[in-house]
UniProtKB/Swiss-Prot annotation:
Keywords: Ribonucleoprotein, Ribosomal protein, RNA-binding, rRNA-binding. Belongs to the universal ribosomal protein uS19 family. The lineage of its organism: Bacteria, Pseudomonadati, Pseudomonadota, Gammaproteobacteria, Chromatiales. It comes from Nitrosococcus oceani (strain ATCC 19707 / BCRC 17464 / JCM 30415 / NCIMB 11848 / C-107). This is Small ribosomal subunit protein uS19. Gene3D superfamilies: 30s Ribosomal Protein S19, Chain A (3.30.860.10). GO terms for molecular function: rRNA binding; structural constituent of ribosome. GO terms for biological process: ribosomal small subunit assembly; translation. It comes from the Bacteria. NCBIfam families: rpsS_bact. GO terms for cellular component: cytoplasm; small ribosomal subunit. Signal peptide: none annotated. InterPro entries: Ribosomal_uS19, Ribosomal_uS19_bac-type, Ribosomal_uS19_CS, Ribosomal_uS19_SF. SUPFAM superfamilies: Ribosomal protein S19. The gene is rpsS. Protein S19 forms a complex with S13 that binds strongly to the 16S ribosomal RNA.
Amino acid sequence: MPRSIKKGPFVDPHLQKKVLEASASQSRRPIKTWSRRSMVVPEMIGLTIAVHNGRQHVPILVTENMVGHKLGEFSPTRTFKGHVANKKSR
């Protein structure tokens, strides 16, 4: 169920502060965050945000198409190795 429109998008306060500082200083360094639950807002466009996936920080360049999605959607937590082939059927 999506968040109520009257509440607005959720962005962790510490991440919002870092985004505003980076956009004001035109910094190109990635912003590290563990907040996968934060929503991508228009202030983040053009910034690189390193989102933690449980093992490492995955750098993500935020574009206009990402606005309204959560940061965790762009940093997969599971790696699919593929199904094991059945050697008996061959």
